[in-house]
């Protein structure tokens, strides 16, 4: 038998998440295509600057999704309806509160973001118009992260697909109507996203209500779920946010150091990063599945189930990582030709293609172990692991003056390897001492 029960359970959750992840860049492509057809490049520049500011802020707040998944999966495994309700309501209160604060302080936040980015006045003006509307979606966007994490934690496999696909399709339709039809330009693109986010929130709440009813969570439980000690949730979110900040800084450094190597290197790295991002979407699907299943095992204090999850994840995601490495080694040149038609960039990209073969095999373990640690809500250890990896990344950047762009890709490989290795050592120590469930 090719797949055992644990393998199938993993794929049931991983496959919808992989499919959902693929819809995310599709939305970006449509945004670019729609805005790119307007009569001035400043519109596209404004949306690009605005999207960068939003992406940075919301990536820092991604802890809302991750912590919610871990806490929910543990409550699900423990079969505790009150904890299940609290795992939804407390993060929702936090998300809505943070979203309202972003709306209230959006003007100074916009001023700060545009001051940091800089650029032409015309582009910054369009970015300002975009952000003034786009950040009105903050409560819905952050609440959607919580709902996505909670529905993933209860292993409702179809929910992420429905939420992301419906939200993105609605966004695309509204983009076309508001930008191209009503000629609202960047304000139309922002309004389309805001509307789609609130529509997604309504759908997500309906799904959550259905699960809560099936699990016997009463209205009285929900009303009281926001009470109770939030210190664990706040500490967990703090640690994951610091981890996310280090991750953002390291990937930002790749862009900064690449820019110093010349415009051709920036362009080539953008092409190669597209390939790496696609790989990450697939491997992230397994990480999400591991979060839910390992969290369930943690909540049930079931060591044998946890080992089953881990072995299945290693088998299945390991094979997927090897498949990506094989495809990139055999057909990488053809893929690059699809991504850029410039012969000079194609030739330059071929020099660094070897890293696309190496990185999936090196990086898969840190994705899986992230999932294990999120499921166990061990945020402090994830933060410390990321700090070790970031230090290794920084030291390896010293090779850039000698190795050039190979030094940048080596730094990324070291970063991924150290994340996986440090988490593996922590996991091994806990398992040997019998302290993983403590």
How does the language model describe each region?
Residues 29, 38-41, 75-78, 153-154, ...:
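Helix-loop interface residues and adjacent transmembrane-helix termini in multi-pass membrane transporters
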Residues 62-65, 133-152, 160-168, 189-204, ...:
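Short runs within selected transmembrane alpha-helices of multi-pass transporters and secretion channels
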Residues 29-33, 146-150, 169-177, 205, ...:
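Alpha-helical transmembrane segments of multipass membrane proteins
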Residues 1-14, 72-139, 173, 181-238, ...:
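Short alpha-helical transmembrane segments in multi-pass integral membrane proteins
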Residues 28-32, 333-334, 377:
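Non-cytoplasmic
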Residues 18-70, 134-141, 231-296, 317-324, ...:
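Transmembrane helix-bundle signature of multi-pass secondary active exporters and lipid flippases
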Residues 44-104, 141-160, 268-330, 366-377, ...:
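Small-residue-rich hydrophobic transmembrane alpha-helices
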